[in-house]
UniProtKB/Swiss-Prot annotation:
Gene3D superfamilies: N-(1-d-carboxylethyl)-l-norvaline Dehydrogenase, domain 2 (1.10.1040.10), NAD(P)-binding Rossmann-like Domain (3.40.50.720)
Record's subcellular location: Cytoplasm
Chemical reaction(s) catalysed: sn-glycerol 3-phosphate + NAD(+) = dihydroxyacetone phosphate + NADH + H(+); sn-glycerol 3-phosphate + NADP(+) = dihydroxyacetone phosphate + NADPH + H(+)
Protein name: Glycerol-3-phosphate dehydrogenase [NAD(P)+]
Record organism: Staphylococcus aureus (strain MRSA252)
SUPFAM superfamilies reported for this sequence: 6-phosphogluconate dehydrogenase C-terminal domain-like, NAD(P)-binding Rossmann-fold domains
Phylogenetic lineage: Bacteria, Bacillati, Bacillota, Bacilli, Bacillales
EC number: 1.1.1.94
Amino acid sequence: MTKITVFGMGSFGTALANVLAENGHDVLMWGKNQEAVDELNTCHTNKKYLKYAKLDVNIIATSDMTKAIQYADIYLMALPTKAMREVATQINDKLTSKKTFIHVAKGIENGTFKRVSEMIEDSISPEYNAGIGVLSGPSHAEEVVVKQPTTVAASSKDKNVSKLTQDLFMNDYLRVYTNDDLVGVELGGALKNIIAVASGIVAGIGYGDNAKAALMTRGLAEISRLGEKLGADPMTFLGLGGIGDLIVTCTSTHSRNFTLGYKLGQGESMDQALSEMNMVVEGIYTTKSVYHLAKEKNVDMPITNALYRVLFENISVKECVKDLMERDKKSE
C-alpha cells in the first residue's frame, strides 16, 4: 500500500486521513500542536475538530517535520491558505527527492492573488516537484468521517496526478471524478466561500428563501465572470467544484464560512464571532484577495464588494443589502 503524509490536523485533513487509512494506505499526520498529536496517537481522536469521530487506529501523528517529510512520497496538504506557502517552503528546505502534492485548501493568497497550487509550485524546487493537484467539491468533513455519501473532483495540470488522487481516495462512500480544469476547480472552491459568508448573513438577518436563492444564483454569476477572466472553463462552475461546493457551503451550519456570516447577520462583530468559533474562516481572507483582484481585472463582483465593506469597512449588513437591491437596472 501507499505511504502518505498529511500536513495539517484540521477537520478536513483528519477526515481524509481516515479515508486513506480505511482504503489501506499508511498515513502519517503532521501538526504543530503536540497535544493534538498525542491525542491522535493515544486515543485515535481529534476532538477539537471532529468531536465524536473515532479514527482508524493505523493513523499515526507527529510534530517532527523531518520525520513527516521522510515518511512518504505523496503529501496531502491540508492547511489553511495563509499557512500554505510557509509550510511548503519549510518542506522544500528538507527535501532530497521528488514528491507529489495534493492540496485541499480553498483560498486565494492575499497580495499575490495566486491559487494554492501556484503557491506550492512557487515554494517547491522543480527538481523535487513530481506534480501538484487539488481535491475539491461539496464535502463537509463531519459527513466524510462518518461515511456519508460524498462526491468530489480531483484536478491537476498533470492527468497522472488527477488519476492518482482518484485512485487513492475513491471508495464506496467517497466518489472522485477527475477534471482537467485546475484553474476552475481551485477558483470554484475558493470563491464560493465569499458567497457562503454572504449567505450566512442573509440567513442571520432572517431573510427568506427568495433572498437565499437570489444570492447563490447571482453569486455563481460573479464567480463565473472572474473565473472565465482568469482562464477557467465556465462549465466547471456547473460541476462539483462549482455549484456543488457552493450549495453545500451556503446552506449548512457545518460550514464555518456560513456560520461566521450567520453570526454577523445576528448582529455580532467579526471579532466576537471569530473568538466564539476558534477556527480559520477562509472566506475572510478570500474576500480581501478577490475584492482587489476583481478591481485589477475589471470584473464586476457586487456581492464580493458588498461583503468586503461589511468585513473591512464596518458597513452595516442591512445597508449593504439595500445597496445591492438598489443597483442600476441590468439585464441578467
